[in-house]
UniProtKB/Swiss-Prot annotation:
HAMAP family according to UniProt: Ribosomal_uS7_B
Protein name: Small ribosomal subunit protein uS7
SUPFAM superfamilies on file: Ribosomal protein S7
Taxonomic lineage: Bacteria, Bacillati, Actinomycetota, Actinomycetes, Micrococcales
Alphabetized GO MF terms: rRNA binding; structural constituent of ribosome; tRNA binding
Length: 156
């Protein structure tokens, strides 16, 4: 085991178009097979579509969508004796951000629109309005934590 503690977080390069680290994180989540320019084209196209549909700042809309998708609680498996319990725990800020981006991109891929740009754009718009599959995933996660509240004393 390392003795120096966890590795330091690398600084995130802000994207050149919007100057926002959140957009950079979204690009990195969309990224597949190292094709960064394709991922950038998808994300920038989706954000441009958000701007056209809402006539407002697309980064603000994205941040609102992420806030609506971020989970506050989740369940983690904990083995006690012979039984495995689903223990509700609070989600740290960094993990909440990562989960919200992962869910947003994942449920964008599952949508029925033609291009990934359209899918991502519509999922961002739905999430910013409190709708969509990513928001439902957050609600399901919270519901699971609520129903397992009895095991909260096993928290670590």
């Amino acid at each position: 085991m390392p003795r120096k503690g966890p590795a330091p977080k690398r600084p995130l390069v802000v994207d050149p178009v919007y100057g926002s680290p959140v957009v950079t994180q979204l690009i990195n989540k969309v990224l597949q097979d190292g094709k960064k320019s394709t991922a950038e084209r998808i994300v920038y196209g989706a954000l441009e579509g958000v701007r056209n549909k809402t006539n407002s700042d697309p980064v603000a809309t994205l941040k609102k969508a992420l806030e609506n998708v971020k989970p506050a609680l989740e369940v983690r498996s904990r083995r006690v004796g012979g039984a495995t319990y689903q223990v509700p725990v609070e989600v740290k800020a960094g993990r909440a951000q990562a989960l919200s981006l992962r869910w947003l991109v994942g449920y964008s891929k599952a949508r029925r629109e033609n291009t990934m740009t359209e899918r991502l754009q519509n999922e961002i718009l739905d999430a910013s309005n409190g709708l969509g599959a990513a928001v439902k995933r957050r609600e399901d996660t919270h519901k699971m934590a609520e129903s397992n509240k009895a095991f909260a004393h096993y928290r670590w």
